């Protein structure tokens, strides 16, 4: 059974590989790189769109193979700004915007509102699609966003987000600390037993053949 990650984001792939003991393949290794239209209105809907798209294409190409496709949709929400960027976090500065462009647009928005620091939270939805069903789990991380970028670790909005109980941004933290507290880490801790269950069921089914 192959575990395939439905993302082309190198930062996300690195995080998933750190958190998973199994080898995780980016979908581009099997299908080549292409864009997936994410037109859902929630993180969960977008994660499912990505996972289903990759799963269906893999099964068309290799119907005899067993796959577990994992997709995550995540973003940051700032209540004082009406919840933005939310599900538009990856394209807050426009379609095709870089992480840096999105980051500095949110920093500029905070400055325009004269917010030095304000509460915010990350959401991660992980969708799991296989022959044996579909599942979605969530994880959250609360803290504050600040009107400057600090640190060069992580990706996305990490350099402006300070998790609750810490005085450093995610961009200043080592990967091990970040993984232990991150929204994606929390969601993946719920996804892992589901993935293991699917692997066990697939193995049992193979043994009976």
From Swiss-Prot:
UniProt keyword list: Hydrolase, Magnesium, Metal-binding, Nucleotide metabolism, Nucleotide-binding
General function of this protein: Pyrophosphatase that catalyzes the hydrolysis of nucleoside triphosphates to their monophosphate derivatives, with a high preference for the non-canonical purine nucleotides XTP (xanthosine triphosphate), dITP (deoxyinosine triphosphate) and ITP. Seems to function as a house-cleaning enzyme that removes non-canonical purine nucleotides from the nucleotide pool, thus preventing their incorporation into DNA/RNA and avoiding chromosomal lesions.
InterPro entries: dITP/XTP_pyrophosphatase, ITPase-like_fam, RdgB/HAM1
EC number: 3.6.1.66
Record has Magnesium as a keyword: yes
Positions of Mg(2+) binding: 73
Residues that coordinate or bind substrate: 7-12, 74, 155-158, 178, 183-184
Lineage of source species: Bacteria, Pseudomonadati, Campylobacterota, Epsilonproteobacteria, Campylobacterales
Protein name listed in UniProt: dITP/XTP pyrophosphatase
Family matches, as Pfam families: Ham1p_like (PF01725)
GO biological process: nucleotide metabolic process; purine nucleoside triphosphate catabolic process
GO terms for MF: dITP diphosphatase activity; ITP diphosphatase activity; metal ion binding; nucleotide binding; ribonucleoside triphosphate phosphatase activity; XTP diphosphatase activity
Quaternary state and interactors: Homodimer.
Cofactor comment text: Binds 1 Mg(2+) ion per subunit.
Top-rank lineage group of the source organism: Bacteria
Cofactors demanded by this protein: Mg(2+)
GO cellular component, one term: cytosol
Name of the top EC class for this enzyme: hydrolase
Membership in a protein family: Belongs to the HAM1 NTPase family.
Swiss-Prot/TrEMBL catalytic activity: XTP + H2O = XMP + diphosphate + H(+); dITP + H2O = dIMP + diphosphate + H(+); ITP + H2O = IMP + diphosphate + H(+)
This protein's record includes keyword Hydrolase: yes
Active site (catalytic residues): 73 (proton acceptor)
